[in-house]
Amino acid sequence: MDIKFEVEGYKFNVRSSCIIKDKEHNKVLLTNMRAITDHEAFLLPGGRLELLENSEEAIKREIEEELNIKLDYKLISVEENIVKSNKFHMLEFVYYAEIDNFDSIECLDDGWDKFKIVEIKEIDNIDIRPKTVKKLIKNDTYTNVTHNINYDWA
């Protein structure tokens, strides 16, 4: 059972996501939000935590379910996304992982139209939610866990 609930029209959920880069740090894998936006926008791959599941277990499960790969994960950020205008509150644990080669990914979840491999040098031209994730993607040294509070998710 996913950790999500709704109270008086306000939605809350807890999510684990991951910045998956190639070894050269030139590319990153993103998830298309086409199903919930009116234009092309992206999230980091991942999904909701299940009840009694920790955030690292969740990201391992989600990536294995969606992409059929096993990676080593490092927690790099906690994002609090609070969007009053949309009555939306999400707590997101962001992890980092590297992959030898994106060609080795076998997409199991809804086909490749759900995912996009993006050149990091082009990241500023792409709509990514929350927008603080762009800074995390461009970072090459994940030495400390960061904490961001986002009131404007778009």
PLM regions: where:
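Residue-level preference for beta-strand/loop junctions
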Residues: 10-12, 40, 87-91
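Residues embedded in well-ordered beta-strands
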Residues: 17-19, 27-29, 94-96
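Conserved Nudix-box catalytic region and its N-terminal flanking loop in Nudix hydrolases
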Residues: 26-65
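Nudix hydrolase/Nudix homology domain
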Residues: 37-41, 110-154
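Unchanged
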Residues: 49-72, 81-132
